[in-house]
Amino acid sequence: MYSPPKVELTHKAFLMTQKWSNINLPGALHYVTGTVRYRIRVFQQDRCCAAFLEVLSVLLEDWPCKLIVFVIMPDHFHLIVNPRDGNIQGFTGALKSLTAKKIVEITGDKRFRLKEPDRDGSTYQVWQDSFKSMPLWSGWMIWQKINYVHANPVRAGLVRSAKDYQWTSFRAFYSRSDEPLPVDQDWWWPDDLEKMSKAMKELGWNSAGQLCKK
């Protein structure tokens, strides 16, 4: 079981936690969603799903980050992660950039082409401009999103049971399987409570207590 940290928030801070804020909050888990441009269903191709997880696996080696759960849907993905530096914007940006290159190589889909190169010189765009993220730290918040992520394929009518969907962390999370990608059983870094308390003070939030423990 996980016990929630004792966290007291100002009303403004509480409202921020109830919606997509995209803030970097060191010490918290982050729930992230990324959506393919024009909702093109590239992840109906197993090769694209495998490539996404391959890139994610390599990125996790180079960028210290805990991977809690994930699911790849036909036109979007969900992750819950804990980057050690708290830089969820940088981590997600790197993931989207690297996976975009792979997806273009695999699909050759002309719908991703830009009329003119963007400011970085890229001639294609696979993902929607922005991403959505939400910081999580209490037990209720974390488990609500974990269950939401794993139930996504069932709600979409892709499978009858979450365990039957191939491109999810359900089996890795509950059975400690390595397929299709292992996840971290220990969600927290040793200094997460200290980092979160400092970050919350800088944001004008009040915090106290302990992080969720397994």
Residue ranges, per PLM feature:
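Short catalytic/metal-binding and nucleic-acid-binding patches
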Residues: 1-214
